[in-house]
Amino acid sequence: YRRQRQMCIRDRMGTMSVEVPEIDQLLAMTSPARYGDELPDEGGRGGALHLSSVLPAISSAIGHPIPTAIHADPKRLQEALGLPDARSAVVVLVDGLGYWNINMRLGHSPYLRSLMADGVNQRPIATCMPSTTVAAMSTFGTGTCPGLTGMTGYTQLNPDNGEICQLISFKNAPAPLKLQQQPTIFERLACLLYTSPSP
């Protein structure tokens, strides 16, 4: 079955060389990915190939590099992710759609298939731990990590009263601006653009 999947991917992609792991390997617990600006060692995860590096890398690509508490070199992230310089950028994010999900269904998306033919796109980026939407979206938006954003899951301890709070409706939760104090990359870009002298 595995050989059949590999051949199917190669047939659809032509030069595609990504080998989809067996399901038990995909579901196995792994150590958390590290943060930073360097490419991970062979077989390693994270560093420049992390969800938190995407927006700092894009900020560099559009000419306004925004470093964060865990990513000091947005230009290095841009190079690691293979992003060209651009005047503007559009980010399309689909919650829950991972690298292996895409690879196993490339026949359904000709555009994604064309992107995956580029070697720089033939490697996954890591997400944060825990990988819930609350933690991951704040990690993505700020270019930092759940420990800095204070957004660690759907339910967590409210530090103000010691009760469990819910972070979808913010029931029993601190005020959102009090809980999540890291500025987003978008907020920081807006500050740059509004304080820059106009031409």
Task: Identify what each model region corresponds to.
Residues 14-89, 96-186:
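Active-site nucleophile/metal-coordination loop of metallo-enzymes that catalyze phosphate/sulfate
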Residues 90-92, 196:
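Hydrophobic/aromatic beta-strand patches that form the interior of the parallel beta-sheet core
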Residues 1-11, 194-199:
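Single conserved hydrophobic/aromatic residue that forms the stacking wall/gate
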Residues 190:
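Anion (oxyanion) recognition and catalysis
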